[in-house]
Amino acid sequence: MSVQIPVALPQNAYEIAIANGGLAAAGTWLQQADLKAGTKLLIVTNPAIGRRYGDRLVAALQEAGFIVDCLTLPAGERYKTPATVQRIYDKALELRLERRSALVALGGGVIGDMTGFAAATWLRGISFVQIPTSLLAMVDASIGGKTGVNHPRGKNLIGAFHQPKLVLIDPETLQTLPVREFRAGMAEVIKYGVIWDRDLFERLEASPFLDRPRSLPANLLTLILERSCRAKAEVVAKDEKESGLRAILNYGHTIGHAVESLTGYRIVNHGEAVAIGMVAAGRLAVALGLWNQDECDRQEAVIAKAGLPTRLPEGIDQAAIVEALQLDKKVQAGKVRFILPTTLGHVTITDQVPSQTLQEVLQAIANP
């Protein structure tokens, strides 16, 4: 099975390739993306992914004539820092990577974000390839060119837009993905259903396998990957630099990022935080008269069915969430912009959220 989805940007167009066995054929895919044999490639990965898939990828790329080296970085959101990216720069310097060289991100969203940021800034910009191995990275983080690292006071505050040459998705890598990480990716899939693709939402809602990722039928997994990637590609093609429409992809992320930051990126993972953020956004939309209660309840039920949290972590200070929102990247003129549903498949962007309403919603989803 192979599906190719174009990301139709005026100057930086590329393809998302969804291909079973894609890792073994990586050399061919990179050549089709205009990376030539003889190019120096630095694969950036983490220990677990490197052990499982590193040798296979290196062999495939070397067979295609690429000059390949690897760098293993620690796993986890708390390591997505400038200090960790410095290690990529150091390795690039050691290997004497040139402007015609390329970085290859093999892993989840953290690896992809850091590798992309290093590629955006090394020699003022070199090529990079995304080979995501988590569901979350496949359907979201690897697509669209957002790269960056965290600041101690906020998530992704340091970054750049830098589009990959190729996104290569091999669904077979999901077979070894821990269940919790698979569920985290489902949060982003549910997001696409709410903001863009009502039919996708209803298929998720009807599936008896949503809480059993290991039992997910292959045809449903293929649909999830293809429809999610198409949704992201369509939005990015319309608004590459997030000047308007693309902000809808941050649905659930406004409060979600605050939750991640306040818990030190240790208690909840990104997908879990987004799930909590979607619950909050849905309830805000109902409170403001933008969304009906029935669809809000349906969203919350699907999130819970997928094994994702619908309440804030215990002990989190709601006032601290409100304060952390002021560091959100979408703040304009001191006002936090929220992405709120109006009907399944459609959302609106507003900065007209009374602080009292926000506090009431946060109180309602607090753990007792």
Curated annotation (Swiss-Prot):
- Principal place of residence: cytoplasm
Identify the keywords attached in UniProt to this record, alphabetized.
Amino-acid biosynthesis, Aromatic amino acid biosynthesis, Cobalt, Cytoplasm, Lyase, Metal-binding, NAD, Nucleotide-binding, Zinc
Write down how the cofactor binds this protein: Binds 1 divalent metal cation per subunit. Can use either Co(2+) or Zn(2+).
Task: Give the enzyme's EC designation.
Answer: 4.2.3.4
Any single GO molecular-function term of the entry would be: 3-dehydroquinate synthase activity
Q: Which InterPro entries match?
A: Dehydroquinate_synthase, DHQ_synth_AroB, DHQ_synth_fam, DHQS/DOIS_N, DHQS_C
A GO CC term? cytoplasm
Q: Which cofactor does it need?
A: Co(2+); Zn(2+); NAD(+)
The biological pathway it contributes to is: Metabolic intermediate biosynthesis; chorismate biosynthesis; chorismate from D-erythrose 4-phosphate and phosphoenolpyruvate: step 2/7
Q: Which Pfam families match?
A: DHQ_synthase, DHQS_C
- Where Zn(2+) binds, per the record, is at 188, 253, 270
Which family, according to UniProt? Belongs to the sugar phosphate cyclases superfamily. Dehydroquinate synthase family.
In UniProt terms, what function does this protein have? Catalyzes the conversion of 3-deoxy-D-arabino-heptulosonate 7-phosphate (DAHP) to dehydroquinate (DHQ).
Identify this protein by name: 3-dehydroquinate synthase
Its source organism is Synechococcus sp. (strain ATCC 27144 / PCC 6301 / SAUG 1402/1)
